[in-house]
Amino acid sequence: MKIAIRQPQAIYELGQRDNQEDSIWPLQGQATDQDFFFILCDGMGGHEHGEVASRIVSQSLAQYLRDHVNPEEIVSDQVLGEALEAAYQALDQADDEAAKKMGTTLCLLLFHRGGLTTMHIGDSRIYHVRPSAKKLLYQSKDHSLVYDLYQAGEISYEEMATSPQKNIITRAMQPGKDNRCKPSVVHITDLRPGDYLYICSDGMLEQMDNDALCQLFSSQDSDEAKRQQLIEATKGNKDNHSAYFVGIASVSSGEGDESLLDDEQTSKDNALNIRPVFEAEEVA
């Protein structure tokens, strides 16, 4: 499977905060249609040096993927686990008494011969939108207290956005070997031209719900116009808010692609033998 993307679009806004704790990769203004991975990290609010943690994780993960991943090949979950461990080790090396509480969320989009692999920790979101059907095909499950309460049936989906506990996350990347949170990993092979992949920090969701998001991506406007609409829709946000969205230009099959699903299953099975252990899913 060979996936071509359009020019990626980045949003990187300070909001009403004094400092920017979000980090994105590629850096704003540097992404091209030749990039094969996209990273977003949101430094944990209320924790010291959240901006340091988000920068360390995004940069160290990007460095590992650049050095060890060939997008023309199937990327195994074992490689992802090694990349994540490298990011955790970078956090450990930066750990000191002044920064011991630093932490960050993580979102990753990784395009490769096997399709798209997504990985996330925390409450930063990943979406797969199909404008031709005018619907969301996939939304990542937040690692947060309110999402756990929603799953347990104690609050409604709408109440998650207004709950006083909405900022409490249950997983984050932090230094210290006792703090190795597991990511959620999803493999997506049903990709079509015109689809969008969207990653965002929770700040982007203050004034943009799923219906509005789906409507925006389903419009006939250009990607640059969609980016400007997202910026306008989130202009009054209090929190830092950042995002990347990537449009699929084309999807084609090549020699050997008939064995991709078996290869992916083998990769996931092998991933169970490494640390951290993944929660992997297939999305048809």
Where do the model's predicted regions map?
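PP2C/PPM-type serine/threonine phosphatase catalytic domain
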Residues: 1-284
